[in-house]
């Protein structure tokens, strides 16, 4: 069975695969971040959102995987086999959990549009030959400040991604990030 844990949220495994494995913080850092930002919602018996549920499940899966790894480490007597299991868990399962945790936390923190736009921007940047791309990769936290997306209204053009050169950009900070943090659920 080929299950894509990102599909219902508008992303895909392929879209996240453009981010290199060293891009994702450690599981411990991601767990600390999730706890600091969303502890109340994660521990609540109430259903908050599909992302909170998915984040809970990823955290629980990591805990179970660590329990299994500890059991294997304590009960597998052959050191070579033990090392193979530990390396497999850290390399493959660890990366998948880090990707899941990063995606869920980013989605809750920055919102769907910003995260998806970041994934597409990074994918385009990384596939562009170095001689033709800017030296620095896109940064997720700066996307809301550097892009302009307008809602579709009657009589307006569908989307404008960058301000026209004639218009000065407002110096007031954008509030998209703080709005997503206000409602924990």
UniProtKB/Swiss-Prot annotation:
The modification Phosphoserine is found at residues 157, 164, 172. Residues 136-185 are annotated as: Disordered. One of its GO terms (cellular component) is host cell. Residues 179-185 are annotated as: RNA binding. One of its GO terms (biological process) is microtubule-dependent intracellular transport of viral material towards nucleus. HAMAP family: HBV_HBEAG (MF_04076). Homodimerizes, then multimerizes. Interacts with cytosol exposed regions of viral L glycoprotein present in the reticulum-to-Golgi compartment. Interacts with human FLNB. Phosphorylated form interacts with host importin alpha; this interaction depends on the exposure of the NLS, which itself depends upon genome maturation and/or phosphorylation of the capsid protein. Interacts with host NUP153. This is Capsid protein. The lineage of its organism: Viruses, Riboviria, Pararnavirae, Artverviricota, Revtraviricetes. The gene is C.
């Amino acid at each position: 069975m080929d299950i894509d844990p990102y599909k219902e949220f508008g992303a895909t495994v392929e879209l996240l695969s453009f981010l290199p494995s060293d891009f994702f913080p450690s599981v411990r850092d991601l767990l600390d971040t999730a706890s600091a930002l969303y502890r109340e919602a994660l521990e609540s018996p109430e259903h908050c959102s599909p992302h909170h549920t998915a984040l809970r499940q990823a955290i629980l899966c990591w805990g179970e995987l660590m329990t299994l790894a500890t059991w294997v480490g304590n009960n597998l007597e052959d050191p070579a086999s033990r090392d193979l299991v530990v390396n497999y868990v850290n390399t493959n399962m660890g990366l998948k959990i880090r990707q899941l945790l990063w995606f869920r936390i980013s989605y809750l923190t920055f919102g769907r549009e910003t995260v998806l736009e970041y994934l597409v921007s990074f994918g385009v940047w990384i596939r562009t030959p170095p001689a033709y791309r800017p030296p620095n990769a896109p940064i997720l936290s700066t996307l809301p400040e550097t892009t302009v997306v307008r809602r579709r209204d009657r009589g307006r053009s569908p989307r404008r991604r960058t301000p026209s050169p004639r218009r000065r950009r407002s110096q007031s900070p954008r509030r998209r990030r703080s709005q997503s943090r206000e409602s924990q659920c």
